[in-house]
Regions:
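General beta-strand structural signal in soluble alpha/beta enzymes
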Residues: 25, 49-53, 87-89, 118-122, ...
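N-terminal phosphate/diphosphate-binding loop that engages ATP/GTP or pyrophosphate donors
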Residues: 39-91, 96
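Loop/turn-to-beta-strand initiation segments
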Residues: 82-85, 114-118, 146
Length: 256
């Protein structure tokens, strides 16, 4: 267990030495907040960041510029020059969200020399704290060098069902749980390790980071021997525990 002081440690977890660095975030319980935090982290290190999605995303309350276009790979150079910017396909007024791009469009964007870091929200969760992927999910660009699977610790020790888990039928199939069951850490470990679970559709040779958000709310329910199983079995390269709304956002980090 290590407390995070030097962000360079996180850059290693994320495979951020690769240029461009494409990081896709999946799961539920803090994806968008994590994207914003990562953008600030990379910007503070002198990297230029573009934030986008392969699904739908609420427009940010931010001073960072927002770009709408049909094909991000065809954007003029000046559109990609901001320290941090958002890029979407179009605005969906009925949903109050911006629609993003197909994963292939983001893969094409990586060929642009102006691109340094591309952060992708690659999954939807309807605002719920936990989910399992449907057949068509998640939508991860093949150019991703890292995928972060987010889960909220708020539900650990709580009764779960369709009211607080997105894609409940898929989640129940993977974990074997029934409605009203109390969620245990071992159930999250099962979701991480299952081939149709949290890291479904992750490209080959892609780094995998498991992030339990809102960790302070469930710290007493975390058994380290259970937590580290995905790391010991090489299902993930790193495990982060923290709260993206607090400081430090990543309080603990486990690596092999």
């Amino acid at each position: 267990m290590k407390s995070i002081i030097d962000p360079a440690a996180l850059f290693i977890d994320l495979g951020a030495q690769k240029r461009p660095t494409v990081i896709s975030v999946v799961g539920a319980g803090g994806k968008t907040s994590l994207l914003f935090w990562l953008a600030q982290l990379f910007q503070s290190g002198g990297r230029r960041v573009l934030i986008t999605t392969t699904t739908h995303m609420f427009l940010p309350e931010s001073t960072w510029p927002v770009i709408f276009c049909r094909d991000p790979a065809m954007l003029p150079r000046t559109s990609l020059s901001s320290p941090v910017s958002f890029c979407f396909h179009h605005w969906k007024a009925t949903q109050g969200k911006a629609k993003g791009f197909a994963p292939e469009a983001i893969d094409a964007l990586t060929q642009r020399p102006e691109c340094d870091v591309i952060l992708v929200e690659a999954d939807g969760s309807r605002g719920m704290p936990l989910k399992a992927p449907d057949e068509h999910e998640p939508c991860i660009p093949q150019s991703s060098c890292c995928v972060i699977a987010v889960m909220s610790g708020l539900l650990l020790g709580e009764k779960i069902g369709a009211e607080n888990v997105h894609r409940w039928p898929q989640f129940a199939d993977i974990t074997g749980l029934t409605p009203g069951t109390t969620l245990q850490l071992s159930d999250l470990v099962t979701l991480v390790r299952h081939p149709l679970g949290a890291f479904k559709n992750v490209p080959q040779d892609c780094r995998r980071v498991w992030f339990i958000n809102r960790f302070s709310h469930c710290e007493n329910t975390i058994a380290q021997s259970e937590l580290l199983k995905p790391l010991q079995q090489h299902d993930v390269e790193a495990i982060w525990l923290g709260d993206i709304q607090e400081f430090p956002a990543i309080a603990r980090r486990f690596v092999n």
